[in-house]
Amino acid sequence: MENHMKVVAFERQQQGTGASRRLRNAGKTTGIVYGGEAAPQMIELDHNALWHALKKEAFHSSILDLEVAGKSQRVLLRDVQYHPFRQLVLHVDFQRIDPKKKLHTKVPLHFLNAESSPAVKLSSAVVSHVVTEIEVECLPADLPEFLEVDLSKIEAGQSLHAKDIVLPNGVALTPHVDAENPVVASATIPAGAVSEEAAAGEGETPAA
């Protein structure tokens, strides 16, 4: 991906619970950048800007351009700690990436065409999204923002698995996902619909 979301952060000098509390009171969120050959770097970010960025799907699954003290580095968001009941981000972790090394990360799934599938059109089935993201491995340049799951051919009683997802060139399922091949979507007929069909069958009067 050529375009990267930009994140601006500042070097954080103070550490500890008290310092973190003071930063939160000042509208800041603490964070850390780690990975690669450089030492871990303590940072702080504007809370409001971070809060709005976290609402974007791409912020969680794309390579980010993190600027700290005027220097940019490519990172992935690896962890977010939220306050248990307030709309507050307590801490974020970013991992540096090496453009020449494959990375393992989760990518969102976008489900398409369920309404035109035989399961829905012919059987009035309900298509359930069992998982909403899948873990892949690829070079940073090949990392997709999301993966599309085509449901147009799914029939009632069928499931789609991880290996059914069409992956872009250079992208593969991680070994454990490939081995487990988990279900990502399934089509089932609601119990009520089955009962109605059964009732209709029972209501038919046999020919004399």
Curated annotation (Swiss-Prot):
Q: Name one GO biological process term.
A: translation
Q: Keywords, A to Z? A: Ribonucleoprotein, Ribosomal protein, RNA-binding, rRNA-binding
Please name the Pfam families in this protein's record: Ribosomal_L25p, Ribosomal_TL5_C
InterPro entries given in the database record = Rbsml_bL25/Gln-tRNA_synth_N (IPR020056), Ribosomal_bL25/Gln-tRNA_synth (IPR011035), Ribosomal_bL25_b-dom (IPR020057), Ribosomal_bL25_C (IPR037121), Ribosomal_bL25_long (IPR001021), Ribosomal_L25_dom (IPR029751), Ribosomal_uL5_bac-type (IPR020930)
What are the annotated GO cellular component locations? cytosolic large ribosomal subunit
State any single GO MF term.
5S rRNA binding
Presence of keyword Nucleus: no
Tell me which PANTHER family the record gives.
RIBOSOMAL PROTEIN L25/GLN-TRNA SYNTHETASE, ANTI-CODON-BINDING DOMAIN-CONTAINING PROTEIN, RIBOSOMAL PROTEIN L25_GLN-TRNA SYNTHETASE, ANTI-CODON-BINDING DOMAIN-CONTAINING PROTEIN
> What family does the Swiss-Prot or TrEMBL record give for this protein?
Belongs to the bacterial ribosomal protein bL25 family. CTC subfamily.
Oligomer status and interactors: Part of the 50S ribosomal subunit; part of the 5S rRNA/L5/L18/L25 subcomplex. Contacts the 5S rRNA. Binds to the 5S rRNA independently of L5 and L18.
What the protein does?
This is one of the proteins that binds to the 5S RNA in the ribosome where it forms part of the central protuberance.
The name this protein goes by in its record = Large ribosomal subunit protein bL25
In its UniProt entry, the species of origin is given as Burkholderia thailandensis (strain ATCC 700388 / DSM 13276 / CCUG 48851 / CIP 106301 / E264)
Gene symbol here is: rplY
